[in-house]
Structure formats: structure tokens, C-alpha cells
Amino acid sequence: MSVLVYTESDNGKFKKNALEAASYAHKLAEQLGTTVTAITINVEDSEVIGNYGVSKILKVTSDKLSIFNAKAYATAIAQAVENEGASAIVVS
């Protein structure tokens, strides 16, 4: 079990709210006694999120996701939740 955080990005870079969400997810994970897993979509330097308490990064890269599509993003996030057995989800 972990806390999963979806980290929003724009043009391959994390948005400020993604970093804030990761930090919040870390605090929540500490309270729950677990770790944080982040899902990133088309982010160039995804390792940066590790500085905000994320211990595992799921990097999704796809040309199909270069333009926001709610259904496709939801599918990717749902798969991550299922694969990781997430006990909580934080969305930026």
C-alpha cells in the first residue's frame, strides 16, 4: 500500500501545484505509515519530484497523452492505483 500522487505538468515540466501535491502526499504517507508513489505523464525531468518525498516514480510517456484527454489520463491513473495497491490518491 502506498499513497499515489498524480503530478500535473505542462510542456514536460512539473507545475507548481504538482510539487505541492507531492509534498502533501508525503505528509499523508507519514501519517499512514507508508510511502509515496508518483505518476508522471510526459515529464522530461521526473526525478525532481523525489525532492518532495516521493520514493517511487511511475513514468508514463506517450504521444497519445501529449494533449490532455480526460479518459486516457484517468485510465493511466486507474492502472497505477491498481498496480500499486494505493490506499490514497492525491491529485494536483
Show the residue positions of the predicted features.
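N-terminal glycine-rich FAD/FM-binding segment characteristic of electron-transfer flavoproteins
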Residues: 1-92
